[in-house]
Design a protein with these regions (language model features):
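Signature of extracytoplasmic/envelope-associated structural regions
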Residues: 1-306
């Protein structure tokens, strides 16, 4: 007998984590990987393969709805004001649920945000790139224990569809000290990249990650800036060994949209171009530094206009 159409499993779903339901723009992917190692023999070659670890990854690009609750999950305070050396998973397990419209609920019992989405600031782009969550063993569990990593259960889908309100799409302007960037070629991209170090035990494999640092950058191709303005913004004339932690914050904002702040920013790249169809200003790159007064590295804020 051939395969029946009704036996093929497919269709969309949504992700719930930290009390927030995420609707995706282009699909949800869950990868559950078992790391392995070969057992070699000089006489016979590979004798066996053994399992060494287990890690899950759930990735999606959020649809773009803006809300304070969503921002609190995607850009948590422990990244805004980096708690270097902290446990990423913490002492209490935070479940992540992928619920399909077809009526199946996959629950990863211990999950954490491990890749922030890029923030895309443009009137013709939704606000977020791809986010990634990592799933590990539940706290104190061995891989062989019951309910140690995930559960699967039938459950009627009841999470609805993404709301039409709060969708992004705003014109953003940047301010950096006396430098004003009122318009760009194709908007701004802000990247927040946590540096995470895995923590493993001999009996369980990876059970946590430690926050080792956070890198925050922003880039845009500005319009209307002169050669002298771009060169003056670069630290070219700073002394060798001089600190590049600037006195000014980079603030990118739009009425009705987000306000993104890179603390104590500096311009690190700013090429100039000459050519028949080339724009003079190339892509400006900024990087953030921790503000020693309040410990903050960046901020992402949204005020609901309603």
């Amino acid at each position: 007998m051939g395969t029946t159409r009704q036996s093929i499993i497919r269709g969309p779903g949504s992700v719930t984590f930290g009390g927030v339901t995420f609707y995706d723009a282009s699909g949800i992917t869950a990868e559950v990987d078992s790391s392995t190692s070969d057992v070699p023999s000089s006489m016979s070659g590979k004798l066996d393969t053994i399992k060494t670890d287990q890690v899950g990854k759930v990735s999606l690009t959020p649809v773009g709805n803006l809300s304070e609750a969503l921002l609190a999950v995607l850009f948590p305070d422990w990244l805004k004001t980096p708690e270097i050396g902290r446990s990423v998973f913490g002492s209490a397990d935070a479940p992540l649920v992928v619920h399909s419209r077809a009526g199946q609920k996959l629950t990863f019992l211990a999950a954490a945000l491990t890749k922030c989405p890029d923030i895309l600031l443009s009137p013709v782009k939704t606000a977020f790139g791809q986010a990634e969550f990592t799933a590990l063993l539940a706290n104190g569990k061995l891989p062989t224990d019951a309910n140690s990593f995930y559960t699967v259960a039938a459950a009627t889908y009841d999470l609805g569809e993404p709301p039409r309100s709060g969708l992004s799409g705003f014109h953003y302007a940047g301010t950096f000290g006396s430098l004003s960037i009122p318009d760009t070629v194709d908007g701004w991209t802000v990247s927040i990249a946590p540096r995470l170090d895995p923590v493993a035990t001999d009996s369980q494999g990876t059970i946590d990650y430690t926050l080792g640092g956070v890198d925050v950058t922003a880039k845009c191709t500005p319009l209307g800036l002169s050669e002298s303005q771009i060169l003056a913004a670069l630290p070219v004339l700073s002394g060798r060994g001089a600190s590049l932690a600037g006195a000014n914050d980079l603030v990118i904002a739009a009425t009705g949209g987000l306000t993104v702040t890179l603390k104590k920013a500096t311009v690190v790249t700013g090429p100039l171009n000459w050519g028949t169809t080339m724009l003079r200003a190339g892509e400006l790159g900024f990087t953030a530094h921790i503000d020693v007064e309040d410990g903050k590295l960046f901020d992402v804020e949204y005020t609901d206009p309603a």
